[in-house]
A protein has these predicted regions:
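A glycine-rich beta-strand to alpha-helix segment
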Residues: 85, 114-115
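N-terminal glycine-rich anion-binding loop in soluble enzyme alpha/beta folds
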Residues: 3-66
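Mixed-charge interfacial surface used for oligomerization/domain docking
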Residues: 3, 9-23, 28-30, 90-93, ...
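N-terminal glycine-rich phosphate/adenylate-binding segment common to multiple enzyme folds
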Residues: 66-97
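Short loop/turn motifs at secondary-structure junctions
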Residues: 1, 77-80, 253
């Protein structure tokens, strides 16, 4: 049997994790220096409202101990492990889990332990994990699942708009001057995950409506198979997420649309008001 593992940056709701038997390892975070209890349900509205009011959020990677404690019981009962994790372009988490996996391979030479960098975050990671878990539940072998996951990683496209450029400035994505000017001019950048899993600016739009129209246009122009699943994540912007989902249906999307409040781990770096769209495509912008 193959056990699927991921991290909380994959943004998968608890019911889906339970349905597919997915184990979630957790990156942790603090708000104004106070550790947050990650065992409690995430209150996205309160989290992003605190950020809007100036709260300082800092995140930490999964510890080696946490990774080891999650994997050892699975290996002890004779199962294999496939971990699909947060992009190495924005976090060292996948690398850290890889180190633990190598240690465990030496202790469990008969077990198959794989660690794959999704080069994504939120549902750009989560949608891939769901398909891998579905394949594992159906008894698909490890090599076939890994090949499929790598194929999906190469096709996943992640585009998002942000409301306030200061969070990108803090993360070194924009200069302070550019962030200040952008705020004055109501410039809303459209960003994307590049082939290496790093965040880059795709375009800059005037106002949120134009930025959302651009997200919809990207879907219309790039997606070859409109029956494929799509992901939407929002940072305390549920009405806009619903509007985006409706617009996707009008644009011909017939696949499942999974919409979630964006998790805090990468949400800390994009800030409140972020709206993201995740889909599969053969092309890049």
């Amino acid at each position: 049997m193959i056990k699927l593992m991921t991290d909380n940056a994959a943004n998968l709701p608890p019911d889906l994790r339970a349905q597919y038997g997915i184990t979630e390892l957790c990156l942790t975070y603090t708000i104004d220096g106070e550790p947050v209890d990650i065992s409690k349900p995430f209150d996205g509205h309160a989290f992003y409202e605190a950020m809007r009011k100036g709260a300082e959020v800092k995140t930490s990677m999964i510890t080696p101990l946490a990774a080891r404690e999650a994997m050892e019981p699975v290996l002890d009962r004779g199962d294999d492990v496939l971990y699909v994790g947060l992009s190495g372009g924005v976090s060292g988490t996948c690398w850290g889990v890889s180190v633990v996996a190598q240690e465990l391979r030496e202790r469990y030479p008969d077990r198959d332990i794989r660690v794959l960098d999704s080069r994504g975050a939120s549902l750009g990671e989560g949608l891939i994990v769901l398909e891998a878990a579905d394949m594992a539940q159906k008894g698909t072998d490890m090599e076939t699942i890994v090949a499929r996951v790598n194929q999906l990683i190469g096709k996943m496209r992640q585009h998002f708009m942000v409301d306030d450029l200061k969070f990108l400035r803090k993360g070194g994505r924009l200069s302070g001057a550019a962030a200040f000017a952008g705020t004055l001019l109501q410039i809303k950048p459209i960003l994307q995950g590049d082939p290496e899993g790093k965040i880059v600016v795709l375009s800059k739009e005037r106002g949120r409506k134009k930025a959302m129209d651009t997200l919809i246009q990207l879907y219309e122009e790039m997606v070859e198979d409109k029956s494929a699943p799509v992901g939407i994540s929002h940072a305390a912007a549920p009405a806009e997420a619903l509007h985006l989902a409706t617009a996707l249906r009008q644009a011909g999307c017939t696949g499942e649309i999974l919409s979630v409040c964006h998790e805090p781990v990468t949400g800390a770096h994009v800030g409140p008001g972020m709206l993201a769209l995740y889909f599969y495509s053969q092309s890049w912008r």
